[in-house]
Curated annotation (Swiss-Prot):
Coiled coil: none annotated. The gene is SC16. Self-assembles to form functional amyloid fibrils called rodlets. Self-assembly into fibrillar rodlets occurs spontaneously at hydrophobic:hydrophilic interfaces and the rodlets further associate laterally to form amphipathic monolayers. The keyword Signal applies. InterPro entries: Hydrophobin, Hydrophobin_CS. CDD domains: hydrophobin_I. It is found in: Secreted; Secreted, Cell wall. The N-terminal tail up to Lys-31 is not required for self-assembly into rodlets and is amenable to modification so that functionalized hydrophobin assemblies can be created. This is Class I hydrophobin SC16.
Amino acid sequence: MRFFATLVLALPALAMATAVPRDVNGGTPPKSCSSGPVYCCNKTEDHLDKGTTALLGLLNIKIGDLKDLVGLNCSPLSVIGVGGNSCSAQTVCCTNTYQHGLVNVGCTPINIGL
């Protein structure tokens, strides 16, 4: 029974372990984009996705003519992880941030090999 309890408590910690992203040439990822910092978003969605447009409407966020992705639950890459940059989700550059990173619009994925 103790083994099972220990396993149940250890699994979330193992799931949170992330790899350090590297660019395609083996270096570390960029710390900023031309529009600001590199973000790590838990999820990216098409700006035309019905659920995404509903969320944007609820938060009164108008994206205008943007045709890029919408990043959800994003954090600047420089504050993620302990002892260095890491991201286990999608790294992106975004033009606008709302709700302290809850929603980022105008996002473009960054090609970083993990």
